[in-house]
Amino acid sequence: MAIKRGIEMEDTIYIKDLRIKTIIGIFDWERKVKQEVSIDLEFPFDCKKAAATDAIEDATDYKAIAKGVIKFVEESSFQLQETLAENIAELVKNDYGIKSIKLRVSKPGAI
């Protein structure tokens, strides 16, 4: 996890290179064997309150977000990376109150 302070004074939380095995792909063999996907998440968070109070309850629980994404991806079975990405974004927004997210999903073995 990294936090970057932007010019507009909004912080950004990064969760990078989550490597997760899942069923993904359109070919018959891809529906039978788990493949590794790599996921990067980037989302805004105002860290001022957490920094001022030094209290965990005022911070974003990025470990819970990472664990939630890992569990979801491991249990999923999509054909397209695009569908997986959309579903991850919805999960993070709905379950963790994140308003916007930048997301990268790649399948290293695909190329």
Residue ranges: model-predicted function:
Residues 2-111:
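N-terminal, polar/charged subdomain of small-to-medium soluble alpha/beta proteins
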